[in-house]
Amino acid sequence: MIPVVALVGRPNVGKSTLFNRLTRTRDALVADFPGLTRDRKYGRAFLSGYEFIVVDTGGIDGSEEGIETKMAEQSLAAIEEADVVLFLTDARAGLTSADLAIAQHLRSRDKTTFVVANKVDGIDADSVCGEFWALGLGEVYQMAAAQGRGVTNMIEYALAPYAEAMGLNRDDDEQAIEEEREYTEEEAEAEQKRLQDLPIKLAIIGKPNVGKSTLINRILGEERVVVYDAPGTTRDSIYIPMEREGREYVLIDTAGVRRRSKVHEVIEKFSVIKTLKAVEDANVVLLVVDAREGIAEQDLGLLGFTLNAGRALVIAVNKWDGIDQTVKDRVKSELDRRLGFIDFAKIHFISALHGTGVGHLYESIEEAYDSATRRVSTSMLTRVMQMSQDDHQPPLVNGRRVKLKYAHAGGYNPPIIVVHGNQVSKLPDSYKRYMMNYFRRSLKVVGTPIQIRFQEGDNPFEGKVDKLTMGQERRRKRALSHINDRKTKGE
């Protein structure tokens, strides 16, 4: 499962700067969720082959109110759910009482923690950073987040235990072959058959109180008492194996504390980190929306993270029973308006409480899974690419027609198609969208985003200036001299 890195420290030590550098953005992917701590920001990060979730926990000032009070609302939850904690300090300001208070709390937790002395640019870092050893958390790592100095080394060291799980210890050629496997027709069919026997990992996500608990209990059966999030299990989602009509599933449950008999009496816990990790680990995401509230900003935030992760998607509009036709029409209109950009996803109107429409979800879930994991041969992808050209020629670029040569698979979940050709980098976005839609229709891809990557046929001489040999240079000079002599005589 994708690791979570929490950035902890007092205000103005550079946590936001490091967050922005790691996520390559100035805005968190998922931020300011209603009902959640305003000071926590979440984002996906990619660095040196590592993929992880990074959390900016906000500043802790260690005031007289007590470190526990300050951390409980914002940073404590992030620390408990994180796999790695980066404790940032300010090398220029030196060791402070707030740093000592935070360190005392971190020592009481069984967490992998790294002390980072930030802002070491332009100072004698070795002499200044020595005092941070007094925090009692081991080695002190130097960094200048604003300039990027030491950031990559820090992440590589902190996440080294996860390298094998992420496939970073494999040979580069082996990894490239797996990512861009060129299947024959027979190999694609055999691989697809193998995938049919694997359980579908289904993450059920949604903002609090939209009915995730009720839906999960409906899926698992009325008689099943579900009590999760017992002490010690707060960090990870619960994985529940089940089977329906011969097809195996693994439900990834993020709903929080609940008991079937008291489902209406328990306020559902909501953990952003738990939800984001579940999305990353799933094959298919089932987003549950409350019909009575419509599409909220929090729904769009979860939807955005799902799309960025490239996961197959099914949307369930819950609590559809008991509302009049006028409200239903308004909700459908709002869905069309706000979710038009994900026209590939199936939308179901259900009642988890009464079971209405729940059975139809499985068909869309299996369809989305099959589309997201389907192996397609190189010959098939190339044929579809050629058909798209026959129906609609690529445009001219500088008087020359863009030429598409062949296509092959570049990855799955989401499906990635790599198209090779000449001048493909100059294709307009409109033609790229046309090709994406053409592949989707031709391959019957439903319920999952699809990515097309264009790879240029590199010209080895492009951008190079021919350098004359010494003999060629002498002949060139003689020729120029001869031309100049003729011009002089002609005058």
From Swiss-Prot:
It comes from the Bacteria. Pfam families: KH_dom-like, MMR_HSR1. GTP 2 binds at residues 206-213, 253-257, 318-321. The keyword Repeat applies. Gene3D superfamilies: 3.30.300.20, P-loop containing nucleotide triphosphate hydrolases (3.40.50.300). One of its GO terms (biological process) is ribosome biogenesis. Residues 472-491 are annotated as: Disordered. Residues 374-458 form the KH-like domain. Associates with the 50S ribosomal subunit. InterPro entries: G_ENGA, GTP-bd, GTPase_Der, KH_dom-like, KH_dom-like_a/b, P-loop_NTPase, Small_GTP-bd. GTP 1 binds at residues 9-16, 56-60, 118-121. Transmembrane segments: none annotated. This is GTPase Der.
